[in-house]
Amino acid sequence: MKTVSIFGSTGAIGQMIIDVILASSDSYQVKALVAKSNVQLLAFQAKVVNAEMVVIADVGLYKELKDLLFGTNVKISVGDVGMQMAASLNVDYVMMAIVGIAALVPMVYLISAGVKVIALANKESVVCGGTLLFNLAREKNVNIIPVDSEHNAIFQILHSNDRENIDKITITGSGGALLYMDHDQMRNITVQETIKHPVWKMGKKISIDSATMVNKSLEIIEAYHLFSVKSEKLDVIIHPEAIVHGIVSYVDGACIAFMSVPDMKISIMYTLSWPNRMSMLYKKLNLASYHQLTFMKPDINKFPGIRLGFEILRTSNIHANSIIFNTANEVAVDAFLNRKIGFLDIVNVIYSTLDMVDCLHINSLSDILECDSIARRVASDIICKLN
C-alpha cells in the first residue's frame, strides 16, 4: 500500500484526487490532508479517507475543526507549523494542489524534507520558484511530476522517447469560455459567463486564466523549467475539443501526440502510480465518437495574454519578470472575481505592473516573496486607479 499526502485537498483538483484515491482505496493510505479554510469539507475528507493528520492554514479555524473531528483519531495542526509537520512526513507521494503562489513555501518545505515524489498541480510555484526550486529538487533528489494535463502529456511522451532531438514542444489549449467572442462581447462579460469552461471542470481562478489565455503563458514558463527547453522550442496551439494535450515534434519531422478524454483524473492516476500505471477507472477515449478534431493558431490580438510567457522568456531577467507576471495576474483575477475591474482589464493590469516593477536580484525564497509583495502592492494600486 502506497502512502500519500494531499496539499490543497479541498480545492477542485484536491477533490478529484480524493475521488481517485477512494476509487482505489485498497492501494493508498492517506497520511495528511492540508487545506486553507474549508473546515467542513476537510473534516469530511479526513473521515472518508481515514487520514492520520489534517492541517488547516487559517489558525482561527482550529476549534471548529477540532469539534468536527471530535471522537476520531485524526491529529490536527494549524498554520505554518502544521504545514512543516505535514511536509516532513515520510510518504511515497505528495499531491500538491494548492492554488497560486501560496504553494511555493510548502513546496520548499517538501523538497527540503526530501520527499520522494511531488505530483504538482500548481504552475505558479514553478513560475515563481524557477531555477531556485528545481536546483533544490535536484540537490535533494526529489522527482516533480506535473499533474496539469498538458505538462503531464509532455512528461509522458518524453519519459518514453528521445529527449535529445526535440525540435518543438507544443502545448495545446482549449481556448476557454470566450474563444469565439469578440472584444465588444468580452468588454461586458460577467464572472459567471467567464468561469463556465466548455470542456474542463476547474476552479474559478484557473477558469479565468483559461479565458484570458494567460494560463498558456504560465504553462509556457512552466514547461521551460520542467523540461529544460529553450523558449524557441516551445509553441501553443488552440484545440477546442481538448483531446490532444501535448505534442512533441522531432528533428526528423516525426510528431508524437498524447491523447485522452479531457479528465484531470487521468493525469492524477498517472502521477499516483508513477512510474507504473493503474487500470483505467473512468471513461476511455473513443476517437470514433469525435467527427473532427480542430486546431488553430492563437489570436494574439484578441488574446494578448498568450504572448506574455514568450515575451518574458526573451527578457534578461526571466525569474523576476515571471514572479511579477504571476502576482499581477493573481491580483487582477481576484479583482475581476470581486467585480472591481472588467475582464479586458486583467491583461492591462499585468502589463502595467510589469512596466512599473523591477526586482533586480532573485537569489533566495525571501527574494521571491519580497518581489511578490512589491508587485502585489503595485498591481493593487493600478486597480484602485482604474476605479
Curated annotation (Swiss-Prot):
Keywords from the named record: Isoprene biosynthesis, Manganese, Metal-binding, NADP, Oxidoreductase
Q: Which GO terms describe its molecular function?
A: 1-deoxy-D-xylulose-5-phosphate reductoisomerase activity; manganese ion binding; NADPH binding
Q: List the disulfide bonds.
A: none
* InterPro entries listed in its UniProt record: DXP_reductoisomerase, DXP_reductoisomerase_C, DXP_reductoisomerase_N, DXPR_C, DXPR_C_sf, NAD(P)-bd_dom_sf
The record's top EC class is oxidoreductase
Q: Please list the residues that bind 1-deoxy-D-xylulose 5-phosphate.
A: K123, S149, E150, S174, H197, S210, N215, K216, E219
The annotated pathway is: Isoprenoid biosynthesis; isopentenyl diphosphate biosynthesis via DXP pathway; isopentenyl diphosphate from 1-deoxy-D-xylulose 5-phosphate: step 1/6
Biological processes per GO annotation:
isopentenyl diphosphate biosynthetic process, methylerythritol 4-phosphate pathway involved in terpenoid biosynthetic process
Task: Give me the residues that bind Mn(2+), please.
Answer: D148, E150, E219
Q: Which reaction does it catalyse?
A: 2-C-methyl-D-erythritol 4-phosphate + NADP(+) = 1-deoxy-D-xylulose 5-phosphate + NADPH + H(+)
Residues given in the record as NADPH binding sites:
T10, G11, I13, N38, N122, E124, G203
- State the needed cofactors, names only: Mg(2+); Mn(2+)
Annotated EC: 1.1.1.267
Xref: PANTHER family: 1-DEOXY-D-XYLULOSE 5-PHOSPHATE REDUCTOISOMERASE, 1-DEOXY-D-XYLULOSE 5-PHOSPHATE REDUCTOISOMERASE, CHLOROPLASTIC
Q: Which family does it belong to?
A: Belongs to the DXR family.
Purpose of the protein: Catalyzes the NADPH-dependent rearrangement and reduction of 1-deoxy-D-xylulose-5-phosphate (DXP) to 2-C-methyl-D-erythritol 4-phosphate (MEP).
Q: Which NCBIfam families match?
A: Dxr (TIGR00243)
Name this polypeptide is given: 1-deoxy-D-xylulose 5-phosphate reductoisomerase
